[in-house]
Amino acid sequence: QINRAAHFCGGRLQTRVANLGTSYSVSIWFWNGMPIDSRPVLGWMFGRGQNYSAQATGEGLGLNAKGQLIFSNEKETLTGKANTERWKWHHAVLVRDQEKVQVYLDGKLEISSEANAVSSVETLFLGGRNNKESSWEGRLDEAAVFDRALSENEVKGLSPR
């Protein structure tokens, strides 16, 4: 069975989601094409913020140089524990419940922390952040945005691993 996925090479998709608020979830299947340790951030697969902002305002979900999931907002960057493999499909879910952030990798909790929420920002990006730095180099598939914080069981149901 053939399953086609969007292949990103420095570009990104932008959309507007009105009234998303500070509780939402994003589910993304990702395939990293960048060599490990090739740059400090291998790529941002999801972002929320004002388009072309000079600073990294807003928030983003991506991979650091080691291939670990990272969540970044205007004040801090949170890092997961597990390394992902290049050229292999993985599933990430970002769960934002106001000031609480959880990030799952292949159904397992990787990041759980408090983080300032982005409010009244309606612009979302796939394949990059609002400032266009370290855009995604690889594939993204079956991305979904939910207007609420998903439960742990719902996240596990999205990731069959």
Which ranges hold each PLM region?
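Beta-strand-rich interaction surfaces with strong enrichment in secreted/lumenal proteins
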Residues: 14-17, 79-84, 113-115
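Short, solvent-exposed beta-strand-to-loop segments that form ligand-recognition rims
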Residues: 105-125
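Short, aromatic/His-centered strand-loop micro-motif at the edge of beta-sheets
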Residues: 69-91
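Extracellular glycan-recognition modules
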Residues: 2-70, 86, 96, 100-104, ...
